[in-house]
Amino acid sequence: MKSKRVMGIAIGHDEIVGIKAYKIEGTIVLEDVIVQKRHSNKGTDVKEFFEYYGEVGISIGCVFESSLQSVYMETPMMHKIDQYLFAHREGKRIFQNEDFPNAIDFASRPGTTEELMCMLIVALERKQVKQVAQGIQQGGGDLRVIDYWPAPLAFSRGRESSMLCITPEEDKVQVSLWNDKFCTAHTLVSLDVNEVLEACKTVYEDSKQFQVPYPKGAIVVGFDETRSKAFESILETYGTIDQVPLHIVDKGEDYNPQNINHEMAYGLAIRLLADGK
């Protein structure tokens, strides 16, 4: 049986990538890849993108390139309303920024005992979230989710319970550990491969308190060819994690698995299909 079609959108510094996909008999089918160069702010660019390439009735997920602001913690079990109040209070305290106010979101799951729960609190710059949401809606898009960078990689490579993610963030490297779609620890380091390897150890050590298993592999994506080659020792140490299998048809042939914006959009499409949105 064929699912409804969805569209994942990734807004990078230089381009917007849209991927249209659906699921049939458990297989992800990628049918279209749309790329548009950026020239203005996020809201204007994404509005124009949807005016040209949007369509009525398709569910939209969006992610835009930004600094990773998240914290993972274990707390006593709380009801949903108390989780909401706690997450917003702690999120504002941890990620307080008077110049660029943040929007706070959270997710929770069972903790290491029946009395505890784990909570992931995430912050995104409120102005950018508003720009993107308004741009999509003004362009006629049916927006279902705005995700945080680089969370969609946990879906595009999400077959393992624990994995390292190494991505660029401005002139540094963001090293994060992901456990069943939750970012349990992250740290920002220089481009030096030895620092990155040490950071991989650090995020795992920080995550052991939550009973996160040893990483089953690593993702290195978003770097140029020279830097990717320099980081090969990371993959040799931890192993590689391939993208979730997909079937490509029609204009989906333009999909570039080495392009981080393409993969982010693909990961969002997988999330939308998994959520049934």
Where do the protein language model's features map onto the residues?
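Early-domain small/polar-rich strand-loop-helix modules and first-structured segments
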Residues: 1-69
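Small-residue (GG/TT-enriched) beta-loop-alpha framework at ligand/catalytic clefts
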Residues: 5-20, 25, 30, 114-217
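Switch/connector loops and helix/strand junctions flanking conserved nucleotide-binding motifs
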Residues: 28, 69-73, 228-231
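Short glycine-rich phosphate-binding loop at a beta-alpha junction
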Residues: 55-70, 211-227, 246
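General beta-strand structural signal in soluble alpha/beta enzymes
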Residues: 62, 102-104, 143-148
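Internal amphipathic helical hairpin motif
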Residues: 64-119
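Short, aromatic/basic amphipathic alpha-helical patches
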Residues: 227-240
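Glycine-rich phosphate-binding/hydrolytic loop that grips phosphoryl groups
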Residues: 245-277
